[in-house]
């Protein structure tokens, strides 16, 4: 399982999931996106980061993980929260034969609408914008203008599990509901009362659903 953190996050976000899955015998790899946050342990500036540079980062991680002798490359799964969920979604769609399944937690498909609401054209985008809680560059917003993210993710035909709280005010539940319609085979599990980010009982419920999903979708020898 390769875990991708969200906007402004680090690999630390994946700790609770990685530990729970590792206790059940799974190999979990968490990493920092290049320029993913001011606290990133990877190289790069937040001004250079975008959905698509993060896709390149994830593709590099996939290639590296596939070369590890203790990893079963036939059972490679992607998991991501927030923007990391969106990155996982487009990356999985670009590599459908390599990725056995995906778990997307409150994936930020909203980012396309946000970019188009902020800027009517590429000419309006400044070199630096303070967005949410950090500075991002022109390269963050420009590729999202008129980007059909649902069309992109629909190329992934294997089973996808989406987990989303119905009290999420950062990424409304409706974006995951639309994703389920776009995917050929996806299931949406709604966590009542959960906001953006899972903790406590919500996190434990999410972990249980992830483990159930993996148990069903692992390719047995």
Language model: regions and residue ranges:
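Short alpha-helix in the alpha/beta-hydrolase fold that links the catalytic acid
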Residues: 158, 172-181
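Short beta-strand/loop motif that positions the catalytic acidic residue
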Residues: 156, 162-164, 168
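Catalytic histidine-centered segment of alpha/beta-hydrolase-like enzymes
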Residues: 194-205
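Alpha/beta-hydrolase fold nucleophile elbow
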Residues: 70-82
């Amino acid at each position: 399982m390769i875990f991708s953190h969200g906007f402004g996050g680090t690999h630390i976000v994946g700790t609770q999931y990685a530990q729970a899955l590792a206790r059940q015998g799974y190999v979990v790899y968490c990493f920092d996106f290049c320029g993913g946050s001011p606290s990133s342990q990877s190289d790069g500036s937040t001004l250079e980061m975008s959905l698509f540079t993060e896709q390149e980062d994830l593709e590099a991680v996939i290639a590296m993980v596939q070369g590890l002798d203790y990893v079963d490359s036939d059972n490679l799964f992607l998991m991501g929260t927030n923007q990391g969920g969106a990155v996982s979604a487009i990356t999985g769609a670009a590599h459908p034969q390599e990725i056995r399944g995906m778990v997307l937690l409150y994936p930020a498909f909203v980012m396309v609408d946000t970019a188009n609401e902020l800027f009517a054209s590429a000419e309006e985008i400044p070199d630096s914008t303070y967005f949410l809680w950090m500075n991002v560059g022109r390269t963050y917003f420009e590729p999202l203008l008129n980007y059909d993210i649902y069309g992109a993710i629909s190329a992934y035909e294997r089973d996808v599990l989406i987990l989303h709280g119905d009290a999420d005010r950062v990424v409304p539940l409706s974006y995951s509901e639309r994703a389920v319609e776009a995917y050929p085979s996806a299931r949406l599990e709604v966590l009542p009362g959960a906001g953006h980010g899972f903790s406590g009982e919500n996190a434990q419920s999410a972990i249980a659903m992830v483990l159930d999903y993996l148990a069903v979708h692992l390719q047995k020898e």
